[in-house]
Amino acid sequence: VLQEAARVKGPVTREMIMLRDIALINRGESCSARYTYNNQSVPPLPINDSVQIRIKDQASDLIYFNYGETVFAIRRAMERCMHYGYSYYTMRMLTQCAILNGEKNNALKYLRLLSKTFFQRKWVEEMRPYVDGVKPLQESACFRMPLKLYREGTELVGTDDNYVEMTLNKKWMYTLTTDPEAQQVALGCAMIMRDQRCFWSQVQRYYEINRDKAFPTHVQEAMLFDVYERKVPGINLSFVKFDER
């Protein structure tokens, strides 16, 4: 994903940006490498066609799952089933959400259906140990980070009004957690939303959790910009360890 993101020239879609951000979150680089990539998205165009395709119709279940929001992921997956019928992709997503939620019976039901198809049997065999508890989810590349965000964040309720990215960013920029990886997600979302109060609140929380570590590169840049360019009053940067460069 990151290799493809680095190759893109010109504007990108919000979907491409969100999937790239998920890859950076999994690598722990959301606050240190995000702005080295292209974040200039394609401007919205007037929709005159009767068929409208949004992020929520294409990849919202995958995006919500990777942020640990299994309820919204299941909802969007089921909506796709209602519109377009069941697919192997949707059944896989429902299986992964059931595993993350600890819903063993549901997970087994989906796996049983998928096992009847020739090309899905290998994937079913890979998932079965996680359902049976033989393999811990924390050791899975697929489940490790979604599980952490599932446990550290609060569950989304209500509706996203079809705005997937804004819903997730707003939720996480207000989330206070003591887990270093989850807190970096919250800090990154505060920067994306350019919310000054949330940003400095998350900066303080990052410092409390990581007193012996330097702030990520983009966070240092944002702090310096706020103090010296935007002239935000009442900010003391004496506690910050800045990179020499």
Question: Model regions: which residues?
Answer:
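Non-catalytic terminal/accessory regions
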Residues: 184, 197, 210, 216-224
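Outer-membrane pore/translocation modules
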Residues: 155-171
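Soluble catalytic regions of membrane-associated enzymes that act on cell-envelope
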Residues: 1-149, 153, 157, 174-175, ...
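Short, surface-exposed linear patches
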Residues: 46, 212-213
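Polybasic, proline/glycine-rich intrinsically disordered low-complexity segments
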Residues: 216-245
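Active/binding-pocket-proximal capping segment
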Residues: 113, 204-209
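Surface-exposed patches in mature extracellular/periplasmic domains of secreted proteins
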Residues: 199-202
